[in-house]
UniProtKB/Swiss-Prot annotation:
GO molecular function, a single term: 4 iron, 4 sulfur cluster binding
Record region (Activating region 3A): 63-64
Positions of the UniProt region annotated as Dimerization: 143-162
Region ranges (Activating region 3B): 84
Official protein name in the record: Fumarate and nitrate reduction regulatory protein
Region annotation Activating region 2C: where it falls in the sequence: 130-131
Length: 250
């Protein structure tokens, strides 16, 4: 009979009965490809705390790197403050994403991470994770894969801002969200925007007025339906074409 003591220990220390083995987004996160023994070792270092409330920050720019954060539910935005004191959003993180990679190179966070809605995160002490990854090749490979995905996303964002017009930027943003929701088991055609239009405009380098005008244009063209923060994609193929995504790269 398998002992349940380690699990009991995790529940007491983390305050939550959900473990990596039971997590619905584990295939997108660090646990992917790990065997049961490796999962148990990872599970024992993860801290699961109370929900992060809307507006609450996981960390601030300048904070020492102590942990990486795996999002279990909710949405987190990453942003920096420019020399002029303006906020610049650099990423929107969904369930399954790992936040904090950019702090590894300098041992401190160069950006802020703030919850856009009530969110649940798994806090993973970085030094212990780094030590474990040296002993577990599969864990190291998965961390590298997650880092690679983040670099790929940054490259796509550079292309988006430098080569695409306003209409193409918003279409690409919505198509990307649709794809990410689908990967997480949610509907790729119906979803709620957890970020404001101001946040979207900030991220895409567009004004709030431009975002609102384009959403109205997309709705008039029957590409999508907009009801407040709720988006329904009516013509996925047309949105995909407008976003500049080929069927081969889908």
């Amino acid at each position: 009979m398998i002992s349940e003591k380690p699990a009991a220990k995790r529940i007491q220390s983390g305050g939550c009965a959900i473990h990596c083995q039971d997590c619905s987004i584990s295939q997108l996160c660090i646990p992917f490809t790990l065997n049961e023994s490796e999962l148990d070792q990872l599970d024992q270092i993860i801290e699961r705390k109370k929900p992060i409330q809307k507006g609450q920050e996981l960390f601030k720019a300048g904070d020492e790197l102590r942990s990486l954060y795996a999002i279990r539910s909710g949405t987190i935005k990453s942003y920096t403050i420019t020399e002029q004191g303006d906020e610049q959003i650099t990423a929107f993180h969904l369930a399954g994403d790992l936040v904090g990679f950019d702090a590894i190179t300098g041992d401190q966070h160069p950006s802020f991470a703030q919850a856009l809605e009530t969110s649940m995160v798994c806090e993973i002490p970085y030094e212990i994770l780094d030590d474990l990854s040296g002993k577990m090749p599969k864990l190291r490979q998965q961390i590298m894969r997650l880092m690679s995905n983040e670099i790929k996303g940054d490259q796509e964002m550079i292309l988006l801002l430098s080569k695409k017009n306003a209409e193409e930027r918003l279409a690409a943003f919505l198509y990307n969200l649709s794809t990410r929701f689908s990967q997480r088991g949610f509907s790729p055609r119906e979803f709620r925007l957890t970020m404001t239009r101001g946040d979207i405009g900030n991220y895409l380098g567009l004004t709030v007025e431009t975002i609102s005008r384009l959403l109205g244009r997309f709705q008039k063209s029957e590409i999508l339906s907009v009801k407040g923060k709720y988006i329904t994609i009516l013509n996925h193929a047309e949105l995909m074409e407008l976003a500049g995504v080929s069927k081969e790269s889908k």
